[in-house]
């Protein structure tokens, strides 16, 4: 059979079918595995992906985190601000680049210069964490030079003798056996400036690094400064040292951290000596506490203003300054064991020039009572000038009457508590709104309150009121008073109590807590924008965590006019002037 040239028809058909199948396989492969994976693909799916990539690129890109160079110190201002973020631009995405997904980023938290100090409290291995104090090294004109001229510090008293023993004064004899064997001194009631500074020198958590300080102490003798120029000097002289101090502080980097709000100082006098409202030469005191920069600082005084927020009351110094815990514990045990034959007692003089004073009524009631002991004080020689006579009377009394002095407060209140005598107050400004750091806010635990208006009108019998208190309650109150003794005395500045906190320790702890809370409020933006300064006394009575105030039962006591124009006849000015008369009497 003759062969036909070329491939048979059946083979050609098979070849064409195979070629066609391979063609479509290549088409599908090219479409799904090559084109779909190319960045520039024009397919529907790839076009949507490209649109999404461009949309993401148009979002603002986050600024990369800044890593602070640890070798570069923080600048002085409290707020270390970041530069504004740069605006992101849409750039062409090259084939080798992958589109970056950008998430929404919140504004970075502010960085404050005091945050390092806050973090020290988190170091549990550091016993001083959160407790460091930085002390300014002031030029001697602000402190030591005043002591060298101690004879000029008071018009009525030579203060030089009280400078001995680190400000405690000369030791007291114990011929009558009223005191314990050690720790008793003839301490002047206005010596807190020196005592506090010398105690600070022994503070266990001092630091030279202000960036870790929980607070900053300014060792300016504000009380001595105002004392030396009050009589016979013009206002320029009275204000000079305070203005000089503020100028010096404001040039310091430590001041710029919080504008002075972490600074504190001590003025061992009543607040009214530092609150001159006008520049009239006849006006009283200096204006330290009204200077704008000084208002940022906290000032510790023996009597604060109920209507101002930058001064805080600390106890008057007593005669007892123990060197060790055992001295305190032995004294407390002795006060518990005493027999007290007198129901109540009073040491003081009448105030005939003050129509609102109830002292004359108290003296009259004491004279007519068979269960009251009276020490009448006036100019000249008096047992009121004898620490042993005063302490002996208090030790033999269950209750000690503590009306207002020439101002709200009296040193006598702390002398009586030191003797284990339950204080009887007649005005909340004498203790309850003053010493809120050192005394319980529930005043009924340690004292009796008899509103002075009832005494003034003759409607209240002190004897009957005190006799109505059950003996078991009296015993409980006396124990509370005795337990408070460490908190209302200043230990010997040359030593330190080990387990007990004295008035210095309580004050420093309170200042640290105040500054720490303020710093946290600044960071969290929780500062109280509704704070009313003239109601400061109400805020001091709030419990921890409370911020809201309202009407109070003591409003009538603090509603009297406040310093209208700062004239010399206003109540606070008169109180300050009259307090100086007590330096002539020798007894407040």
From Swiss-Prot:
The keyword Transmembrane applies. The chain crosses the membrane at residues 15-35. GO terms for molecular function: glycosyltransferase activity. It is a single-pass type II membrane protein. Residues 1-14 are cytoplasmic. Residues 549-566 have a biased composition (Basic and acidic residues). Pfam families: Exostosin_GT47. The keyword Glycosyltransferase applies. This is Xyloglucan galactosyltransferase KATAMARI1 homolog. It comes from Oryza sativa subsp. japonica.
